[in-house]
Structure formats: C-alpha cells, structure tokens
Amino acid sequence: MLKLTALVALLLGAASATPTPSPPASDEGITKRATSFYYPNMDHVNAPRGFAPDLDGDFNYPIYQTVNAGDGNALQNAITTDGKGGSRHPQWFASQPRVVYIPPGTYTISKTLRFNTDTILMGDPTNPPIIKAAAGFSGDQTLISAQDPSTNEKGELSFAVAIKNVVLDTTAIPGGNSFTALWWGVAQAAHLQNVRITMSSSSGGNGHTGIRMGRGSTLGLADVRVERGQNGIWIDGHQQASFHNIYFFQNTIGMLISSGNTFSIFSSTFDTCGTAFPTLAGSPWIALIDAKSINSGVTFTTNQFPSFMIENLTKDNGTPVVVVRGSTLVGASSHVNTYSYGNTVGRNPTYGDVTSSNTRPSALAPGGRYPYVAPPTYGDLPISSFLNVKDPAQNGNRQVKGDNTINEADTLNAILELAASQNKVAYFPFGKYRVDSTLFIPKGSRIVGEAWATITGNGNFFKNENSPQPVVSVGRAGDVGIAQLQDLRVTTNDVLPGAILVQFNMAGNNPGDVALWNSLVTVGGTRGAQALANACTNNSNECKGAFIGIHVAKGSSPYIQNVWELGLRDHIAENFSGGTSHRRERWNFGPIRRNATCLYPIGSGHWWLYQLNLHNAANVVVSLLQAETNYHQGANTQQIPPAPWVANVGTWGDPDFSWCNGGDKRCRMGPANFINGGSNIYTYASAAWAFFSGPGQGCAQFECQQTIHWIASTPSNLQAFGLCSKDSVNTLRLGDGTFINTQNGYTGGWTPGGGDVARYTT
C-alpha cells in the first residue's frame, strides 16, 4: 500500500554487465536516408542504445526498428518481431517496448496494420511519412488498429501505444464506403502527437471515420488534424477521454458520440463541418471548452436527454449553437460564455439548463483562454542539440548502464547538469535507470525518453515515511525557469514507504515551461520489481509501497498532460511470479501561487487514500480526471483504510475517514476527488469508477462505494462540472456536509449505475 502523492551514481568500471549487442537482424538491408531528425540519428546498435533489462537475458532485443522508405509491407513485422524469429509478448506494457521509425515516404498497405501493446509508431516531423490505404484494401475496413489483438473486445486492457508525426490517408477508398483510418479502442498510456488524417469526402450520409474510439479507456488525444470524411472522431463505447487541440476540417460530422460516458474537448476547432457535435444515444457528460466554430452548422445537437456544457465558444455564422430534441435552446451567437444543461446542485428542478458568465482569473487563463502547449517534436533541432545520457562521448566520459543493477543517481545528476549547461536535450534511451537517492531535474532541462524510459527508485533513502523523499525532483524550491519532460516512466523497485515518485518544486514564467507530457507513474505489477511483488501478498496486511505518486509542492506550477498514475497493487500486468501489491498512493497538490497548474488530463487509479487531493490548492484547471477506486477496498476489504497508514491530516491533508463508523467498509474507500480548501479550482470532467468491492467481489448498482467525490472544505471559486461516478451511493459530498445522492436526481453517464453532477459552483 503506498503512501504516495501521485508521479533517475556510481562511476562504473571499464567492463559493463550489458553485452554489446549485434546489429538487429531486421535492420539488414535497410537503406539509410539522410534526415536531420534526432531519433534515427541516435546510436541504436552499440552500448548507448536502448536496452530492455527484464527479458530474462535477451540482451539483443531491439527497441528500435525501421523500414525502407515506402515499404508498407514491412511495417507489420517491424511492430511484432522480437528480433530473433518470434513475436513480442502480448499485453506487456512496460518491459518489451518497440519504436518503429518510419522514414519520409508513402507506405501503401492493403490490410490492417495492428499494434502490440507498448508500441510507438514514430514518423519524421521534418517530412511526415504517409501511411495510405490501397484502393484494393481487404479484410477489416480499418487502416490502423492500435488495439492489441490479444485483448479481443476489451480495449480497456490495451495499454501504452502512440503514433507520432504521421499522416494517415484513406483517399483511395471511395468516399461513400464505411472505412476507419484509426481504430483507437485502447486504454491509458496512449497518445497521439502531430498526426494528420485525410479522407475522401462522404457521400449520401455514409463515409470514412478518422478516429473510431470503440470500447476502451483512454485519457487524452491531442494535436490531430482530421480532414473530410463522414466523421472526424466517432466515440463508440469509450469510457472517457479528453481532447486537446483537435482541428476538424470539412467533416460531415466533427465528433459523433453513439456510446460513452465522460468527455471533455478543449482548444479545438470545427472548420466547415456540417454538424460539429451530435450525440445519438445515452447520457454522456460532455464539456466543450475554448472551442471555435468556423463556417459550420449546429454546434451541439442531440435527440436524448443530455448532460453537457459549453464555455467560451466563438462562432462565425448564423446557425444555432444548441438543439435538443428538435428545439433550439441556444440560437445563433458569436460567443457563448458559459451554458450548461444537466443535473445541477442548487437548481429547482435539479435537471435543466443554466446560463452564466464565468470570469477566469488571469493567472489561470491568460487572455481569457486556458493555455495549451503541445509537447515538442524537436524536429527543428539538429542531432548536435541532444545529449544521449548513455554515451560517454557526449556525457562527460561517464558510464551509464540503465539496466537496474546499480545506483546511477549521482552520475545522472551530473549528466543532467551538463546537458542543461550546454542547452542540450537530454535523451534517455529505453532502460531502467536505478536511483538510490533523488534524481534532480535542474532548471534549464529538456528531457525526452525513448519508449517510456524508466527511472526506478530503490533503497533505504526512500523507506522513511516520516521523512519522505522524491525519486525525481523537478527543480528545487524557489527555482523559476524551464524543465520539460516527456515520454518517461517513474516507478519503484521495492516497498518504499517514504518515496515521493515525482515532486514538482519549480515554477515557470510561462505555461508549459515546467511540463510533463505523455508519461507514467507506476508502482508494482510489472517485471523488474520482484522484491515489491513478493513483499505484498497479504490482503489483510497491506504493504506501504510508496508515499506519494506526484506531489506539486508550494510555489510550483506544472503543466501536466496525459499522465497516468497507476498503483498496480491489485493485479499483475505482466506475467511473472509474485504477489499482488497493495499500497497507499495519492496525487497531492499543495498551495500554488504562480500561474496555472494544468492537468490535461490525468489518470489516477487504484491508490489507497484518494486519487487526487487538492489540498489548499490555488489556480488549478483539470480538463479530465480518470479515477478508479482500489479494487481491494469495499465491503470485502481485508484491511480498512486508512490502515495500514496513519493519516497525516495536518501536513499532507490526508483523509482520515473520521466521518465513517469504524467498521463501515463502503464509507472507508478512497475518494476520487478529495478537495480541501483553496481557491480558483476549475474542473470540467471527472470519470470516477468503482469496479469492485474488495478482492473478488463485484459491485451492485449504486452500492459499491458510499461517496466517490468529497469536498472537505469548500474552496473560494470552485467551478466543478461533470463529476461522474459508477456504482456510488453518493456521487458528491459538499463542504457543508450535504450528500448528493446519486439516485435522487443525479443519475447519468455510466449505464447502468452511473451518477452525474453536471454542475456545482461556488
């Protein structure tokens, strides 16, 4: 059990424990083509290359694969091969990654390209490659499926995939055919970056879909341009998602929802779309924030009983904004400030619409709009602007293994200082970089990992829960400047009750100066942490796996986008022997005084005391929180929270569950949102799901958890929208002690058993 607030030595001798690999056989016959992009120019063959240490002695497994320009037939093998004549393991999301670099060119394929878990398709941002559907495309009418085939219909089990710097082209397929460019029935730790989808124009009400989101559990999709076709994005069974910076161009329908639960759309544009946003079924929560409608039809329309909001919409023509069941509720308007329709606390009757004016504080929304900062592709930088942390020729003649065998904290700290002083991007090849003391990210840092390169905490330094220490510290208290990190994973090797996995201590001058994009914070459940798994086998004596996942300390102001914080205590994600591990973890946000803290979106699941703790926080915007209550809590729990921990209410703002009877196991379940004071809290979608009521025990409708969102003390200016739940008696507890009972007018979202507080503002 981790007491976490949820989120990398020694100089080595001349000999290395990691053998120098032979060139991967699959690279034989590959023609090298000149490019200025850093990634293919890194050393992917010799000792500084990426290395997977948890493959039972397979020292030559190739992280990196590439193909000849234009060779579409080679792409599938590049994804699936294990480099020695076999195939990669299905559903391993941390230990056997693959990055397929695609040089510039056009790659025509005639059947669906299918991903394994832990796969990144990496194009060249200087000249993005085109993956094109052949005119004679056969089989499933889908160009790319990012879902691991071994998960069958359960897309929520298909983790860790990404597509970067790629164009998907379906224009050779007739426009009236049903065809999908990208099937995105996937789960967390998935992302898109700098992707363009171009389709044939629709015909007769039929046509192509850019991205179809079937059954799955994604956090965020961002930086996509989707052109023409019938549907830009079709949500067809997804649990939740947050969208940022999506450009819909000439789609018949921009974003279609036919099945799903909780969604938010930020900083997106509908340009020359027939209809921007129709919903056909169910009652999903939808938040449309800072959107633009250009030369497009109705913005939001539904034939259902909706639950949605629109805030800060600009629109340039005379078509209606909102049409519900044939009636125009918001007519043509050049600007909509704040309009919501749904279950509203304080409204009589509860269900209906509210029009209001919401003035965002300038610290949170400079110029009136929430900031959006895309993760850099670094396509504009030459290879000389990068420092490979494993390459002695670049890192000051230091030796780094990245194989989880020795403490590399001191060495890596020196290397990161060197990179920052030289204004270079620090590149971490895939590996496990063990640190037995804090890895400090200095001011001036830019860091990019290969395939979620992993920093793993280890040792006695992180074992004192009375003096918790960060595994990774982003800056130091009082620092102001730049520290930008992406594509990393931070985890632990052992039971570390004093480990704060990631702590943000510094602030930036501008939004995104201090940032973490497309990364993971995990504890347990994967290979390479056998000591932790073996120590955590007793459901009646939960182990204290770590202290906090990500801690945003006083004075810091990070920009956190698409980060999944997961305590894999209650199941094993990769096949190895060992127990399940149960810990206390949490996100904890201290008082924030500078600029905005942006959570765009975040996933926090299976932690013990709570999923997100906003403790006296100020100036925070959450586009979406995806939260899952720990599977071992509830009516069948073997140890009642806060045990085995002692709640620290004063210092860390822990919930102590003192409002519950001592034996009330449904009451003593960690909340999704735990909000305690503060000011200027804007949260637009919370997808909070309770799936189990203790080990092996499922949930009855509305009866799994007593209360899933908890306000201990009401912040000044709390703007809370789309607080959704699954199988909770009460969806929300207010700061004055009032409980918002789900079945008393607040159902919606998840079907059946779902709750939806569309609006609660103070």
From Swiss-Prot:
Enzyme Commission (EC) number: 3.2.1.39
SUPFAM superfamilies from the UniProt entry: Pectin lyase-like (SSF51126)
Leading EC class: hydrolase
Reaction it catalyzes: Hydrolysis of (1->3)-beta-D-glucosidic linkages in (1->3)-beta-D-glucans
Residues excised as propeptide: 17-33
The entry's keywords: Cleavage on pair of basic residues, Glycosidase, Hydrolase, Secreted, Signal
Domain notes: The C-terminal cysteine-rich region may function as a fungal cell wall binding domain.
Name this polypeptide is given: Glucan endo-1,3-beta-glucosidase BGN13.1
Species per Swiss-Prot/TrEMBL record: Trichoderma harzianum (Hypocrea lixii)
